[in-house]
Amino acid sequence: VRGCICPHPPLLIPEIGGASLARVEATVRGMQALAADLGEPETIVVLSPHTPSYADAHVVKVAARLTGDFGSFGCPQAAFTFDNDPALVDLLLALAGGDREVMLVPGEDDLLDHGVLVPLSFLRPQKLVSISIVNAYGEHRALGKLVRRCAEELGRDVVFVASGDLSHRLTPDAPAGYDPRGRSFDELVVRAAEAGDFASLSNLERGLVGGAGECGLRSFIALGGFLGDDATADPHVYSYEGPFGVGYLVARFGRPEGPAVA
């Protein structure tokens, strides 16, 4: 079983980042190393906090082909197209229908947001499944477990990508302003990633999470559900940095290469 944590700042796209790429060199190298370690998995499932959703229902895109570009960031020429995995999507929807812990509905649009596109500008899946988050943090672990169950039933080589940035309040000039809880939050998440300790992420104090101004914790909790007891098997943190007041973490869990499902 394999999964990873990926940041999603659009400035990682060279045409957008320009000279600023030099300030996120550790993140770029981390993503490149992650991509090399993962190889070309059969399917990548991405959970993005920026995918349009409902407050209480995850949305999984059902279009045969999924597309997106960075036009909203002034770079429409950076465009991507991926094949969906209809068998996995169909099974997710079918099993969610009988699972009271997961509310999952089909999404008809084929557009991918930057929370999906930035990680996928480095990674090389044969197929892509895109799922959104919901409001309640605690419900995401069950979603991850559902994805794991479906991958096992299909015998799929699935990599779960938890897309998300850490605190947006690390410095006085950060996008969301400064809050000292931001640094504390990031330190806790990085330590948890180093140990594969996803259980601790589900029990973080609510005030700390709110003060941090994060956008990745829900995705990380879902990844923990997907990995289960395998989370501690081979955790590896490639990089962490926050040069613009936002924390960027790149980490992998599970074997570097090989099928996610035996």
Task: Describe the residue ranges of each PLM region.
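Short conserved catalytic/interaction loops centered on acidic-Pro-aromatic/His motifs
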Residues: V158, R169-D173
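Non-transmembrane, aqueous-exposed alpha-helical and coiled segments at domain scale
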Residues: K145-E153, V158
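Flexible, D/E/H-enriched segments
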Residues: V1-P41, S53-K145, A174-A262
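Beta-strand elements within well-structured catalytic alpha/beta cores of enzymes
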Residues: T43-S48, R156-G164
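Catalytic metal-binding/acid-base residues of hydrolase active sites
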Residues: H50-P52, L166-S167
